[in-house]
Each structure stands twice: as structure tokens, then as C-alpha cells.
Amino acid sequence: MALCEAVASGSPLVWPRVLLFGDSITQFSFQQGGWGASLADMLVRKCDVLNRGFSGYNTRWAKIILPRLVRKGSGLDSPVAVTIFFGANDSALKDENPKQHVPLEEFVANLRSMVRYLRSVDVPEGRLILITPPPLCEAAWAQECLQQGCKLNRLNSVVGEYARACLQVAQDCGADALDLWSLMQKDGQDFSSYLSDGLHLSPKGNEFVFSHLWPLIEKKVSSLPFLLPYWRDIAEARPELSLLGDGDH
């Protein structure tokens, strides 16, 4: 069978998608050992894991770009799961970092706006996971700020306010939530080892995020098949009979 004939006779193979939407903690998640890379590894031949992390972004900017990332009529199925992972920049102190700071009330409104938009493009709440920012190690981040010639521009207590607001939005909307801020500080443990510079994740922090996020993702994708046949199951004489079906596993 000529290649053009094979292509014409086979049904299009649509890869389901998991969308990771967030700030630098998402952008960096595809680095070696990152939580996003670990998700992609777990979902090989089941889903494409798309990294849509934008370093330095807050929810004010995120809600503007979201319709450019997910829309109806794009020729792609809607994502089977979406993580929304903001707050680390929104919670920056207004006096020290006014550009990234977003007031708490606006942060809540922006999260709700993104959830509403996703619902409008056929991504229901049951596919969403809202992730709180991790706790801030003020001592380590203060050193980072000092090296950049600025004062400490975030406080862990303030980050906690944004984390609690994120959880409330998830509860109100019926979405899943991952409370990193609380989990990393559970029982008063030293959480500094989860962070590379007081704000961003260390290798141990990436492992922590993956271990807690995977169960939430898994229940949303557990019914998805392994795409295309196992190589031993491909018909030897006429492989097209095995390979030009409906993406059966």
C-alpha cells in the first residue's frame, strides 16, 4: 500500500492533552527531574503533557492569555486535565514588587474567571486542579533578593492568604485542589529543602509535587488507552490492519 493511500484510509489519531498552566514553577517543571517531566513520562503514549508555564506571570496576565491557549474550534479535543498553578507572584508585596503584585480580591476573581472560561470551552470543573503556591522560605529568598539589589518582597504569611483563597475558589467551583502551602509545612516540618532559592522548587520539591499531584491526575486519565498496538501485536503480513484503526491499544 502506498503511503498516501495508507494515510487516506486511516482515521486521524488524536492524542489527548494534559495542560499545565502556571508561572515559573510550571515553566521549570520540564527540567530534569521536574514534576511536569515526571507527569509526561507517566503518560507516554496516553497523553501529551503541554507545559504552558510563564515565568514571572500572575493571574492578571494569565486570564488574558488563557483564551489563546485553549479555545473551541481549534481542531483539537479539549484537555482531559488542566492544572492552574499561580499565586507565587500575585502574593508579592505591593510596596516592594508592584508590577507582579495582585490584590487578594482580584486574585480570587481572576481564578474564578479562568475557571468560568474553561467551562465555556468544554473543560468542566471535574478536569481542573487548582494548585496553591508553595510556602516561602523567607531567609533564603531574602538572600536572593539581596543579590538582586532589592529588599525582601514576599512573606510566607501573605503567601498563605493566597493559598487559602485558591482552595476556597476550588471548593466553590467544584474543582480539585492541591494545597502545597500546607502540605509542605505539615506538622511544623522544615520545608526549606523543598525549595532551591526560597521560592522555586528544588529536586526534592519537584518530587514532592509530583507525588501529590499524580493521584489527582491519574483519576482523570485512568480510562485512557495505550495508543496504538503493542509491537508484538502488529500483524506481520499486513501491518496496516493493525495500525490504521481507531487508535486501539
From Swiss-Prot:
It is an enzyme of class 3 (hydrolase). The active site is at 24 (nucleophile), 197 (proton donor), 200 (proton acceptor). GO terms for biological process: lipid catabolic process. Pfam families: Lipase_GDSL (PF00657). One of its GO terms (molecular function) is hydrolase activity, acting on ester bonds. Its EC number is 3.1.-.-. Keywords: Hydrolase, Lipid degradation, Lipid metabolism. The record marks 56, 89 as: Transition state stabilizer. InterPro entries: GDSL, Iah1-like, SGNH_hydro_sf. Gene3D superfamilies: SGNH hydrolase. SUPFAM superfamilies: SGNH hydrolase. CDD domains: Isoamyl_acetate_hydrolase_like. The keyword Hydrolase applies. The keyword Lipid metabolism applies. The modification N6-succinyllysine is found at residue 63. Probable lipase. Belongs to the 'GDSL' lipolytic enzyme family. IAH1 subfamily. This is Isoamyl acetate-hydrolyzing esterase 1 homolog. It comes from Bos taurus. The gene is IAH1.
